[in-house]
Amino acid sequence: MDFYYMPGGGGCRTVIMVAKALGLELNKKLLNTMEGEQLKPEFVKLNPQHTIPTLVDNGFSIWESRAIAVYLVEKYGKDDYLLPNDPKKRAVINQRLYFDMGTLYESFAKYYYPLFRTGKPGSDEDLKRIETAFGFLDTFLEGQEYVAGDQLTVADIAILSTVSTFEVSEFDFSKYSNVSRWYDNAKKVTPGWDENWEGLMAMKALFDARKLAAK
């Protein structure tokens, strides 16, 4: 299956880790969005929104990292690994995935993306959004090992990608003890962590270069 990506992209790293956990080989196709390669007609035909990551599995095209992750587990996963069949457990996983997209990662984007354009982060209010999001995550993890219950799921992998992005961006979340505990464990038990970290280093290099250029 073809996988269009950039190594540093948070969503791209999520899919890579999920594929690794499932034992799937991705035919990785580097797409340089900085050069506008996502706007080429052949790619827009696959994904009208021209975003990454995008997966093409035997002619079926799907994008948005969390949708890709769930698709891969539903099609190729075994038993209840990464995505239990129980409706209540799955509902909690879905809630955590939506939380990651709409609250946790969104708070990162609001505060850190301006660094790419101006060399300065977002406002104090934007920083408070990050603190609020981590407070929620810390509460979710109270008394449990994983973000959506007692086993590793796609929600852990997606949120691991996001939290590790905060780490390399030098956001200190050590005061959130449950998050710190979970993060230390998740790094050890999640397949593909090493490749996630390699992608983060690529992201950090780009991040640092943009900050310097914006000064």
Swiss-Prot record:
Task: Give the EC number.
Answer: 2.5.1.18
Residues noted as binding glutathione in the record, renumbered to the chain: H50, T51, I52, E64, S65, R66
Which GO cellular component terms, listed alphabetically, does the Swiss-Prot or TrEMBL entry include? cytoplasm
Q: Which InterPro entries match?
A: Glutathione-S-Trfase_C-like, Glutathione-S-Trfase_C_sf, Glutathione_S-Trfase, Glutathione_S-Trfase_N, GST_C, Thioredoxin-like_sf
Q: Which Gene3D superfamilies match?
A: 1.20.1050.10, Glutaredoxin
Biological process (GO) annotations held by this record are: glutathione metabolic process
Question: What are this entry's molecular-function GO terms?
Answer: glutathione peroxidase activity; glutathione transferase activity
Coiled-coil-forming residues are none
Q: Which residues form the GST C-terminal domain?
A: 86-212
* Keyword terms of this UniProt record: Detoxification, Transferase
Kindly give the Pfam families that the UniProt entry links to this protein: GST_C (PF00043), GST_N (PF02798)
Could you tell me what this protein does?
Conjugation of reduced glutathione to a wide number of exogenous and endogenous hydrophobic electrophiles. May be involved in detoxification.
What family does the Swiss-Prot or TrEMBL record give for this protein? Belongs to the GST superfamily. Delta family.
Protein name, please?
Glutathione S-transferase D2
Q: Which organism is it from?
A: Drosophila melanogaster (Fruit fly)
